[in-house]
Amino acid sequence: MFLNSLDLPGPPENSRVVVAMSGGVDSSVVAGLLKREGYDVVGITLQLYDHGAATHRAGACCAGQDIEDARRVAETLRIPYYVLDYESRFREAVIDPFAESYARGETPIPCVACNQTVKFADLLVTARELGADALATGHYIRSVSYGTHRALFRPLDSERDQSYFLFATTQEQIDYLRFPLGNLPKARVREIAKEMGLTVADKHDSQDICFVPQGKYSDVIAKLRPEASNPGDIVHINGQILGQHSGIINYTVGQRRGIGVATGEALYVIFLDVENARVIVGPREMLETHKLFLRDVNWLGDERLENFPSDCIDVAAKIRSTRPPRPARLYYKEGIFSVDLLEGESSVAPGQACVFYNESGDGARVLGGGFITHSERSTDAEERLQRVLHN
C-alpha cells in the first residue's frame, strides 16, 4: 500500500490534516509544509486565555495577538482557519490544577497538563469530527511507525527537544498525531518561514507558562488560592527560625536566590511544610537524592505492566526539560513506579516530571513518564528533616 509522507494511505490530496496553530513560527511552518505537499489542511487555534498584558507580551501563546498572527498565516497559505473558545476548559484543566499544585508545595508543569487534556484530547476529538486523518502540531519530537503502532523519539534538534512535555500522550493519541518538525533544526524552520513569506518568521518563541502575565506566577496563584500567600516562618534544618516569608507560593524546592534571609551560609529551600506554612532551608547536600517515586505514570514501553520485570529496566531518565537523559533504573512493584538515578540529582521538587527513554542518545525513544511525589534523601538528611517537621 502506498503511504504518503505522514504514513497515511494514498496521495496527500486524499488526506485531511488539522494543524494546531498557536500563532508561532513552528506550527505555521507545519501548516505551510503540509499545504505545499498537497494535503487538505485545516488550521485551528484554541483561544485558551485572555490575560490583559499577557495577550501582547513577547512569548505569550494562544492569546489575542497570536490568534491574529495565525489568521494572517492561514490567509497567506490559503487554508481554512477556525478559532475555538477553550478559555473555560483551559482554566478547569490547566490553570486551576496549576494553582492547587503550587498551594500544595509542588512545582507543577502546566504544559504537560495542557498537552494531556486540551491539545491532545479535546482538539483531537474536534479534528476527528472534521473528518481529519491526522492532527499535526509544531512540537519538536519525532513520531515513527513502530510495529503496529507509532512511537515517540527525541528530535533531530536536541536543543529544541520537547519530548519531556509529551510523555503523557496516550498510545491512541500518538497514532493519530503527526510532528513534521521532528527531523528539522529550528534554524531551517525559520528559513522555510521566510521562503513562504510568513509574517511570523522572526517571531519570538513561546514561553513555558503561557498564561502567566510578565512571568509572575505567584500573582495568578494568589488570586486563585489566596491561602497560599499566608505568611510563615523560614526555618533552618537545625530548627532555628531565621525569618518570615510572605507565602509558600514564592518558593520552590531547590531555590537559592530570593529566600529572604542572610546568614553567611549558602542556603537552599529543602522542603515546603504546607500544613504549617513553613519554608525549611539548609545546605545543598540536603537536596541530593538517588531515588524518586512517581504517580500518574504513562507507560509507553513494549512490556505490558503485568509482565514488567521483577527486578528493573535499564532506562535513561530526564527530570528537567533542559537536561539530557541520564542513566537510571526503573522499578514497578505493587502498582508503584520508582526510579534509581545512577548519577544522582539535586533539587528535585514534587510535581516535576520524570521521563523515561530507552537510551541517553539524541535519537532515544520515549518510554513514558510520571510526576514525582517525593524523593529519597540520605538517611541523615531525612532524619534531620523529620525532626524539624515534628517540632
UniProtKB/Swiss-Prot annotation:
Catalyzes the 2-thiolation of uridine at the wobble position (U34) of tRNA, leading to the formation of s(2)U34. It is found in: Cytoplasm. Keywords: ATP-binding, Cytoplasm, Disulfide bond, Nucleotide-binding, RNA-binding, Transferase, tRNA processing, tRNA-binding. The active site is at C114 (nucleophile), C210 (cysteine persulfide intermediate). SUPFAM superfamilies: Adenine nucleotide alpha hydrolases-like. It comes from Bartonella bacilliformis (strain ATCC 35685 / KC583 / Herrer 020/F12,63). Its EC number is 2.8.1.13. One of its GO terms (molecular function) is tRNA binding. The gene is mnmA. This is tRNA-specific 2-thiouridylase MnmA. It comes from the Bacteria. The lineage of its organism: Bacteria, Pseudomonadati, Pseudomonadota, Alphaproteobacteria, Hyphomicrobiales.
